[in-house]
A protein has these predicted regions:
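An exposed, glycine/acidic-rich loop-and-rim segment of catalytic or binding clefts
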Residues: 1-230
Length: 230
C-alpha cells in the first residue's frame, strides 16, 4: 500500500510477505529495503528480529542504511526510490540504467513456508567501475554469530572472510546466528564469495559480498543470492 512520498513526490510503498508459523517480512521500495522481519514469540505474538521502520521518513533518515540495498560504496544510494511490483508471491524492485554509470538493477524478494527469505540481486549493462550489490540486513537481539570460512569458524568483526567451500554461482551455507536465551537460530546462505560481521548501535549484520569486485561488461548478467532461514 501507499506508505508516503519522497521529497520529489515519488510514491513510497510498503509490502508484506507472510508465511506459515506467523513469520512476516516487510519491504519498501525506498532503498529496496527490508523494513522489518517478524517471527512468533513464545506467547504466539510477533517479535521483531530486525530493526523496524514505522515510517518512510525514519527509513530514509537512517544513514546507516540498515535493511537497504547497497551498490558498491556509492554514497546516498540507499535513498533511491525503486520501481516495484508484485509477481504472485514475489516482490520485484527495479532501477533503470542511469547517467551515473550504473546498469539496470533489480532485487527479488521471496518468502516460503519453510521460513526461507531469499534476496536476489540482478544487474545487466557495462560499468566502468567495479560493481557489487548487497542488502545490509541488521538483526537485533542477543545474537552470537559464527561465520563458515576457509580459515575455520570465525566470530571476529570487521574484515571480509572467504566463505568455506565457495563455488561461483552456487548457493552455500555461510553463517549462522544463535540466540540461546530466545531459542532462535538464523542460517545464512549466499552465492557471494565473502562474508563479514558489521555492528551498529548494538545490532549486527552478516554482510555477504565481494571485497574485490570487477566491472561488468555488456554480456554478463550479474546475479547474486542470499537466503535467511529463520
Amino acid at each position: 500500500y501507499l506508505w508516503g512520498a519522497s521529497a520529489e513526490g515519488e510514491g513510497i510503498l510498503l509490502y508484506t510477505l507472510r508465511c506459515a508459523g506467523g513469520r512476516e517480512v516487510r519491504l519498501s521500495n525506498a532503498g529496496a529495503a527490508v523494513t522489518g522481519i517478524f517471527a512468533a514469540g513464545a506467547d504466539g505474538r510477533p517479535e521483531a528480529l530486525t530493526p523496524v521502520f514505522e515510517t518512510p521518513e525514519a527509513l530514509l533518515a537512517d544513514y546507516a542504511d540498515r535493511g537497504k540495498t547497497l551498490c558498491a560504496n556509492r554514497y546516498g544510494f540507499g535513498q533511491r526510490i525503486w520501481q516495484s511490483r508484485v509477481e504472485t508471491d514475489r516482490i520485484v524492485m527495479e532501477l533503470p540504467a542511469g547517467d551515473d554509470g550504473l546498469p539496470v538493477m533489480a532485487v527479488l524478494f521471496d518468502l516460503d513456508d519453510d521460513g526461507q527469505f531469499a534476496v536476489t540481486h540482478l544487474a545487466r549493462g557495462a560499468t566502468a567501475a567495479p560493481f557489487t550489490m548487497t542488502t545490509q540486513l541488521f538483526w537485533q537481539g542477543d545474537w552470537r554469530p559464527t561465520l563458515r570460512t576457509q580459515e575455520g569458524p570465525a566470530t571476529d568483526d570487521g574484515r571480509f572472510y572467504p566463505v568455506e567451500g565457495w563455488r561461483q554461482n552456487i548457493l552455500g551455507e555461510a553463517a549462522r546466528l544463535d540466540d540461546p536465551a530466545a531459542g532462535r537460530t538464523i542460517e545464512i546462505l549466499t552465492s557471494q564469495p565473502e562474508i563479514r560481521i558489521v555492528r551498529h548501535d548494538g545490532q549486527l549484520a552478516l554482510l555477504c559480498g565481494d571485497s574485490r569486485p570487477t566491472p561488468l561488461d555488456d554480456e554478463t548478467l550479474y546475479c547474486q543470492k542470499d537466503v535467511y532461514r529463520f
